[in-house]
């Protein structure tokens, strides 16, 4: 409920890129934490969903270690939201339905991109993209693309102000209820 209130407030203040969320994951192989922005596509019953290439480095990290941290900052309201959760793939049917509703251009990019792989030049990206556009059949979801969802078990809401007496509230799931704590700035 608190997240929805903060989200609605940011929308009312015309927050740009409101769907941008940082996802941090852990690589067992390199013993490093990696962070990147993704586009949050859906929030439904506290279930957050975004889509990606299943062959990407982040996808491999999700398999190695399903614990993630997510971070959102909305400058229009000076609000930061930190989230902890376990991540999992969405179903093939869910992916197929979502993919079939997307634009041809977005699907061509999803099909043509080998996300995060090294390339010789940006020209090759454009060439592969145009090749996918020309090939057609852009409503069939490839096996290597799909969604990830997570249901938070921890939220921290940070509200900044000029005095630096920032307001911080945390919510931790405890069985079937949320325990609330006020945190020092």
Pin down the residues of each PLM region:
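Binding-site signature for planar aromatic cofactors or substrates
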Residues: 1-185
């Amino acid at each position: 409920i608190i997240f929805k209130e903060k989200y609605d407030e940011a929308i009312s203040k015309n927050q740009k890129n409101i769907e941008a969320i940082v996802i941090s994951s852990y690589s067992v192989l390199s013993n490093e934490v990696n962070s990147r922005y993704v586009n949050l596509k859906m929030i439904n019953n506290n279930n957050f969903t975004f889509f990606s290439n299943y062959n990407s480095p982040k996808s491999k990290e999700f398999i190695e270690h399903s614990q993630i941290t997510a971070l959102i900052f909305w400058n229009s309201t000076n609000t930061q939201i930190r989230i902890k959760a376990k991540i999992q793939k969405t179903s093939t049917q869910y992916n197929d339905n979502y993919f079939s509703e997307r634009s041809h251009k977005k699907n061509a990019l999803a099909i043509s991109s080998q996300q995060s792989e090294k390339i010789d030049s940006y020209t090759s990206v454009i060439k592969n993209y145009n090749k996918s556009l020309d090939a057609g059949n852009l409503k069939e979801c490839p096996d290597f693309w799909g969604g990830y969802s997570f249901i938070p078990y921890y939220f921290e809401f940070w509200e900044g102000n000029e005095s630096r007496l920032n307001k911080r509230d945390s919510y931790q799931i405890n069985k079937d209820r949320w325990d609330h704590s006020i945190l020092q700035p």
